[in-house]
Amino acid sequence: MANIKSAKKRAKQTVVRNARNVAQRSMLRTAVKKVIKALDANDAAGAQAAFAVAQPILDRFSARGLIHKNKAARHKSRLNDRIKALAAA
């Protein structure tokens, strides 16, 4: 255990930030899964609505450094491609 005051503070901050990051990462995964679930159900309107919710979450978390910007771009691109293919079919 840390003895120095600043090290104790850093340890507390790490716990709080870790809890926040876990919750936000879970929210992100849930948003992406909702889009995928709508796509699997062939629900174009539902997928589009879920994507409209997931896209700003991906952007926000990539800007904050929670996920890499390329990962966010890859998710958005692949989901959007699937939505377009479903709408065209």
Curated annotation (Swiss-Prot):
Keywords: Ribonucleoprotein, Ribosomal protein, RNA-binding, rRNA-binding. Pfam families: Ribosomal_S20p. SUPFAM superfamilies: Ribosomal protein S20. InterPro entries: Ribosomal_bS20, Ribosomal_bS20_sf. One of its GO terms (biological process) is translation. GO terms for cellular component: cytosol; small ribosomal subunit. One of its GO terms (molecular function) is structural constituent of ribosome. It comes from the Bacteria. The keyword Iron does not apply. NCBIfam families: S20. Belongs to the bacterial ribosomal protein bS20 family. Binds directly to 16S ribosomal RNA. This is Small ribosomal subunit protein bS20. It comes from Stenotrophomonas maltophilia (strain R551-3).
